[in-house]
Amino acid sequence: MSKETREYAKQLVSQMTLEEKMSQMVYQSPAIERLGIPAYNWWNEALHGVARAGVATVFPQAIGLAATFDKGLLQEIGDVVSTEGRAKFNEFSRKGDRGIYKGLTFWAPNVNIFRDPRWGRGHETYGEDPYLTGELGCAYIRGLQGPDPDHPKAAACAKHFAVHSGPEAIRHEFDARVSKHDLYDTYLYAFKRCVKDAKVEAVMGAYNRVNGEPACGSKTLLKDILRDEFGFEGHVVSDCWAIIDFHEHHRVTKNVEESAARAANNGCDLNCGVAFLHLPKAYEDGLVSEEAITAAVERLMEIRIRLGMMKDYPSPYEDLSYDLVECKEHVDLSVEAARRSMVLLKNENNMLPLDVKKIRSIAVIGPNANSRAALVGNYQGTSSRYITPLEGIQQYVGDDVRVTYAEGCHLYKNKVEGLGEDKDRFKEAVIAAEHADVVVLCLGLDATVEGEEGDAGNEYASGDKLGLNLPGLQEELLETITAVGKPVVLVLSAGSAIDLSWAEEHVPAILDSWYPGARGGKAVAEALFGDYAPNGKLPVTFYQGTENLPEFTDYSMAGRTYRYTDKNILYPFGYGLTYGKISYSGAKTEQETSAVLDDVTVCTKVKNESAYPLHESVEVYVKYKNAQPGEPGFQLKGIACVELQAGEEKEVSVTLHARDFAVITEDGGCVVRPGEYEISIGGQQPGERSRALTGRETEILTVRKEGNEENVEY
């Protein structure tokens, strides 16, 4: 922020009465006409496109975007999303519509860590790895906010601060107990990067407590860490109705006045909810100072000024046209993002791609074959057109191939029709399979099965999954259709890891499409028939069941994610196949020995030996050879996305900085130790399971750091 806008905000707030200041701290902020301040609603959503505000381009859900491992793509998508948001805001404002979801302060991205595959909101995140989450979160923020901090196109918000990833059912009362090691090693890293590197404008506090303190009123989180350690200068907003949880569920305050005061005094500037309507009474009771109120409102006015909401500080984006909303270029990018997000989990005997010239009939079967809900996930906008996998296949093959559809079963119930018998669509599915040359079986989840507390609508626990199996009758449908004996391709639509152990053993081809966006069925069809080669990578670990996972409520990282366990892994983090082969060779570094704080650059040659152009994500992992018990193994510390034409070879280099070699100590310190480090560079995570699935080894280099143990900035 500039000195000009900061002084403007101070001058503006100095003219407000105390009551006017307090009125601006609720998400439905009223106009102050005598000061030229228009009404504004701060609650706006843009997780993977402008959401809940009518028509907009609907991109793949965040977890699918994470599977691209591509920072450049995420920034480009963020730029498109804020362009559409700004275009809509411009037109809505001209017509006097300042309602909810029609503003410029977008409460995205979600940079929580998907630490447990049962968490219902995990598909809103960028996966289980702090480094990947930080890199992609920063890229999306840069795209949303634009290049000029004094004139942002929109304001992004990193959420939910902090240590927040389920269980959904008890999020309003839950106390996440976490060690300093895990706090800094896992839960805070992406937020730090969003603040320091991407200059995110806002941070949203979480519902839960962290080590006894409610997150939206935590001195430790909001003052000591966010403001003092991270140097955050933007505004803090509460999650919706989180502040009333202080007294109603957490029982750390006695009443709403105490709750509102605790939040405001500890640095929460804006309340999504009603608690701050009680700030006047809290002030009367001596619970909150005018200084705290003034500081909060100055921060809120400052970003509104920079966004161009005051007449004498115009925005360069105020003429963006509504014609840009869901324009062809934006839709094309959404489909390209869907293509880039597809992860090929299995392709036995090169079953894929299918040869349309050799197929006369295709059976498209499953509850997600023609489901719009399975395209979009949650926090989604409205598209003017949807293309499901069934529709994508029909459009691709045209009249040359007979496409038969059967729902097969309900997503999670035992029957489709209310008055029907159990398995009332099974026989139809079997008949369709029997009459087809090949079966495309579309199974998985949607946001009614995995989602947010209060939004998910079935028997699962308030949005969280009870386990990792396909729900309802889907597993039985999978086995029944496979038993018909026709070639089967399993297309998975889900925002999280599913236990596909049976499918891995019995189904020849498996494609994970995540929630691929409004027109994602087009990308699915093109992948199946070989218009392009899927080449996404898993941003989460796929486990064989939950037997070896810790309790869901245990926030220790021991036994969780690829960084802290290698037990019962079906598909590893960073894994993904493609059509043909990508080879790596000649890994090297010129800094085999270096000082503790020196950078290390690693290089490798990458060759596309397939017949398709590819975007390959080169993954770099680092491990300290003498790691102590409780410290992680190999960790992702570098990504390079390289575009390769068929047959093309390129040399790729990645520079690792001192922080990439650091470990977090028990007391939360960040240190680089002298000694030997292993660096893996390749197209996958190092390890036995990756090697077994791909048939490839990753090249591992050893470098030595010399000198004394050094502290580095977290």
Regions found by a protein language model. Name each.
Residues 1-665, 673-681, 685, 713-714:
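Glycoside hydrolase catalytic-domain context in secreted enzymes
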Residues 689-713:
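Short beta-strand elements
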Residues 667-670, 690:
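Short proline/glycine-enriched turn/loop segments at secondary-structure junctions
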